[in-house]
Every structure is written in C-alpha cells, then in structure tokens.
Amino acid sequence: MSRLATRFEQLKSQQRKALVSYVMAGDPQPQVSVPLLHKMVEAGVDVIELGLPFSDPMADGPVIALAAERALAAGTNTLDALNMVKEFRQNDSETPVVLMGYLNPVEVIGYEKFVSHAKACGVDGVLLVDLPPEEAKEFDVVLKQHDMDQIFLLAPTSTDQRIEHVVKQASGFIYYVSLKGVTGAATLDVTEAAERIAKIKTKTSVPVGVGFGISDAASAKAMGQVADAVIVGSAFVKPFATLAIDQAVEQTVNKVKELRAALDELV
C-alpha cells in the first residue's frame, strides 16, 4: 500500500481528517525547507505538498506567486526540490510527500527521468496544475510504473465529463478547489463545497481533499466536516513574505497547531 493510502487509512480508522500543508521548496532560502517540514509534521501535518518553484505560476494567487519568486531568486530549481525530499526522508519515512507544480519544468527534464528521480528521492505523488486528465495519460503511465500517485484538481466549474475523467484516473487523493479563482482567495462557500464533494464521493473511494481559501480554525473545521482532508497553503507561506525566518517558521508552526486542533475537534 502506498504511503498516501496508508496515511488516509490510518486517519479514517481514527475518524480524523488529514491536514495537508503546502510549502514552496526553497522559500525563502533552500536551507529553511527541510527543517520547516519536520517541524510542521511534528505540529500535526499529515501530508506534505511541496511546491516546485516556477516563473509563471498562473493558478496561484499573489502569496504563492511571490513565494515562487523568492525561491527562484534563492537559486532553487526542480531538482533541488527533489533533493529536499531525499533529505527529508533521512528522518521521516512515513509522511507522504506530493509535488505540486506546473508541466513545463517536468517536460524539460523528461517524464521518465523526472519520475524515476522523484521516486528515488521518496516522493509519493505529483500534481501538475496545468495538466488536465484528458492529456495526462502518458504521464500517468510513467507514474504508475514507479508506483506513484497522480493527483488531479476538480473545481466548482468542473463539468460532469471532467469529474468522470478525474475519478477514473486519480489515485492518492483528489484535490477539490473550493473557490473559483486563484490560491489564497477570500470567500468560501461551504454549502456548495459540501454538495460537490458529496457528488464526487458517490463516484470514487479515493479520498477528497479541499483547498484554496482555508486559513483559520473556523474554515478548516467547516471544510473538515465535508472532506477527507483540508489543504492549506497561503496561510503557511504568507509569514515568509514579511517576517524574519525564525519568526516566520514559528508563526507557520503555530498555524499548523491551530488548524490541527480545530480538525481534531471533529473527532
């Protein structure tokens, strides 16, 4: 059983919800990332999404886009991000790690080379934001050869046809985007999300996580009631835009604790 499947099974047996954290690799400095990931796991993160810095992150709001700029300015590239996972794995062989990024850098490296190296470093799955399921078959074949999961996005605007494509191909978990827009946007419609997630879950046993717009205990708890996982990015990344590194790490870890406590109230 994959690390993702194992983690979701464990949580399900405990009637707990997964807290999935997004961190941009190399933000604000490459040496910050691995210690930060360990601290976040210690504070209650169940699954890590590691962002691959890219110069044109079209699906991301200003917080994540600026994080990508900081990481790139610090010299972080895609292979550096994979090596961070390798370093993380020296002390953590259990927490699933999913890479989240864009297609272009992966195509430049080549599917086989990228996936085999990612697997060797200890990566469990990949979410390429701009690779729709209809065009993802070739990449999926390579991932499956290496026992890795391909994570797909679904949104309030997804057609029935897109939902069918995703539930057929997805493994690990499905990432439901709770807002029409970019990451870190402001307003959440819990009722609409609940209806859409319920519809998706009638078609698949793959866990469904919900993200975009979750930034505090109240929104985490609300979404935790309707999904298997709550995915948080901007709220963890934001402190690094303005604070000294130590302060930013502390604030991010405290945010993890706040959200973990909120989700555990649902047990």
Swiss-Prot record:
Pathway: Amino-acid biosynthesis; L-tryptophan biosynthesis; L-tryptophan from chorismate: step 5/5. The active site is at E49, D60. One of its GO terms (cellular component) is cytosol. Pfam families: Trp_syntA. GO terms for molecular function: tryptophan synthase activity. Its EC number is 4.2.1.20. Keywords: Amino-acid biosynthesis, Aromatic amino acid biosynthesis, Lyase, Tryptophan biosynthesis. PROSITE patterns: TRP_SYNTHASE_ALPHA (PS00167). The keyword Transport does not apply. CDD domains: Tryptophan_synthase_alpha (cd04724). InterPro entries: Aldolase_TIM, RibuloseP-bd_barrel, Trp_synthase_alpha_AS, Trp_synthase_suA. It comes from the Bacteria. The keyword Lyase applies. It catalyses: (1S,2R)-1-C-(indol-3-yl)glycerol 3-phosphate + L-serine = D-glyceraldehyde 3-phosphate + L-tryptophan + H2O. The alpha subunit is responsible for the aldol cleavage of indoleglycerol phosphate to indole and glyceraldehyde 3-phosphate. Belongs to the TrpA family. This is Tryptophan synthase alpha chain. It comes from Acinetobacter baylyi (strain ATCC 33305 / BD413 / ADP1). The gene is trpA.
